[in-house]
Amino acid sequence: RRSWFIPSLARSLNDCMEDEYAFLLEAMENMRELRTKCTYLFLLDEPIVYHQNEKWICPQNLRLAAYYRNEEVDAFHFYDRQPVTDQKGICQLMSDDERHQFMIFLLFSGEKQYGLLACDIQQEEFPFFYVISLQIGLSLHYLEISKAEARRRQEMSRDLELVRERNRVLGFISKYDELTGLLNLRGFTEQTKKFCSSEINQRA
């Protein structure tokens, strides 16, 4: 069963590249299917790049993004995510008055770290869930690329509309005198051509 689970997880997450909220829910639904006792997914506001031999600095922008516990799956939009703070750490955000043995997996792709995954699983399951975490990290990388492409498309759409509006204004200015509103030479010539063309068509 587990031999085909990783490709299935990859496909299901890749189908959610247009919607981060759906992506998070799908990730937790997969944790439910794997029968973890509970799972918590924490994400950084922005991925952090760690280079080899650099001093590690504890991130200040880690937030609870989704969870699965007591057969309940939930996810949070960015501005609804609870941050990890000195007063309310990871353990407090995962507290449900039950005893747990969490295995913690860093979610990364290449040199970028995206967050961490906390799963209440048996120790012998660690290698398999490590591979799961690698796939989630890779899918988070694809999600980051997808969001960047969506932003670029929006910017290009705005720029194109701005160019069209400027062309409309320039076209109007080039046809009319700004002070009098009368047709200038170009505008008069174009209007005359249209008038002559319509006269010819009517005679035909």
Language-model features, listed with the residues they occupy:
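Short regulatory alpha-helical segment in sensory/regulatory domains of signaling proteins that mediates
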Residues: 10-18, 26-36, 196, 200
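Conserved nucleotide-binding and Mg2+-coordinating catalytic segments in signaling enzymes
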Residues: 11, 171-190
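The cytosolic transmitter module of two-component sensor histidine kinases
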Residues: 16-20, 24, 125, 129, ...
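Amphipathic alpha-helical "output/dimerization" segments
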Residues: 121-158
